[in-house]
């Protein structure tokens, strides 16, 4: 069902209920273990290994960067008939159509991440950084990314606001990646495969970007990484980057609902304060409440909708020795054992 703002009817996202009595592991799923060890799996194939630092200073990622086969992909490649069916849609009509396309595709895809429970799809759009802010990089691709800042469409106090302050991490195609949670790496967007500028799909999407028909990128929120991983759209993101066209990002997350407690005494005090504020003469230096501000306060005051709590589910099946051995073998095969010690010791 579509979620709309109670204030102005603005589209906020798509809520999805996946039926099922038990949460069996989806094809794309997380595993966890002691010492904050994490592994993202595509079937029986690891996509990445991760481990958090003890004081939450950041997280190490070791990525396989293996592209999914068509049979394993979370979303099959978008084809021309699909693009033609959605061509020309703009604004909310476009957002709703692509949201439903991805949800319906995930429902039927063998490589899906959907499990039984509630899911939420929110759209983030790019905002331009002020022109006075100097670029930090000499790489033209990175300079484009530094100008893109994302936040979710619609303003709602209960729904998550997915903000991407920098997309530069998607250019990092090293096997090993460090996310500094005290720096600019909160809410990062993580690529799960390498993309070359001369790939056929990149060239095709560059043409669609110039036509204004570039579909959104689909990402999955993982709280344990404080980041989102790209489920579908690696080539579209690269095409948008090369054409200086910021693609929309649809962020998928699991959630549950918590009842919103109602404090009638507090509500009465706020109402009395508002009445006094409205009736009192305007004092110097104090702006009067306009009708829009007053309506916003009243809407929040009487908003008793359940609070959506974002979740990341994982199976606690990892053994410390197994995780360390896999990471060691993977790095050794790629001549990156220089990165092993800080990862195993969980230090920067």
Can you say where each PLM-predicted feature lies in the sequence?
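Solvent-exposed functional surfaces
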Residues: 1-55, 59, 237, 245-246, ...
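A sequence-level detector for short glycine-anchored, His/Arg-bearing signature motifs
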Residues: 227-243
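Short alpha-helix boundary/capping and kink motifs at helix termini
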Residues: 18-229, 248
């Amino acid at each position: 069902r579509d979620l709309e703002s109670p204030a102005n009817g603005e589209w906020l996202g798509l809520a999805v209920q996946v039926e099922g009595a038990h949460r069996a592991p989806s094809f794309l799923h997380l595993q966890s273990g002691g010492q904050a060890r994490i592994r993202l799996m595509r079937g029986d194939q690891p996509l990445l290994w991760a481990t958090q630092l003890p004081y939450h200073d950041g997280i190490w990622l070791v990525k396989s960067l293996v592209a999914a086969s068509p049979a394993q992909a979370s979303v099959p490649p978008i084809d021309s008939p699909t693009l033609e069916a959605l061509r020309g849609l703009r604004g909310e009509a476009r957002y709703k159509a692509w949201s439903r396309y991805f949800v319906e595709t995930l429902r039927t895809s063998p490589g899906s991440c959907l499990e039984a429970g509630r899911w939420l799809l929110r759209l983030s759009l790019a905002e331009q950084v002020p022109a006075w802010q100097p670029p930090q990089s000499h790489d033209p691709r990175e300079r484009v990314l530094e100008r893109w800042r994302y936040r979710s469409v619609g303003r709602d106090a209960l729904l998550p606001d997915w903000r991407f302050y920098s997309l530069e991490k998607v250019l990092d195609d090293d096997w090993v990646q460090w996310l500094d949670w005290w720096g600019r790496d909160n809410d990062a967007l993580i690529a799960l495969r390498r993309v070359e500028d001369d790939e056929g799909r990149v060239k095709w999407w560059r043409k669609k970007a110039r036509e204004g028909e570039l579909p959104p990128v689909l990402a999955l929120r993982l709280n344990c990484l404080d980041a989102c991983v790209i489920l579908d759209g690696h080539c579209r993101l690269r095409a948008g980057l090369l054409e200086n066209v910021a693609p929309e990002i649809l962020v998928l997350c699991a959630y549950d609902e918590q009842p919103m407690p109602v404090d009638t005494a507090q509500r009465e005090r706020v109402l009395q304060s508002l009445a006094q504020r409205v009736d009192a003469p305007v004092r110097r230096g104090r702006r009067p409440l306009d009708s829009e501000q007053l309506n916003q306060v009243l809407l929040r005051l009487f908003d008793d909708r359940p609070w959506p709590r974002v979740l990341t589910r994982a199976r606690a099946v990892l053994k410390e020795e197994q995780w360390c051995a896999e990471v060691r073998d993977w790095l050794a095969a790629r001549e990156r054992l220089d990165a092993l010690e800080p990862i195993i010791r969980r230090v920067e």
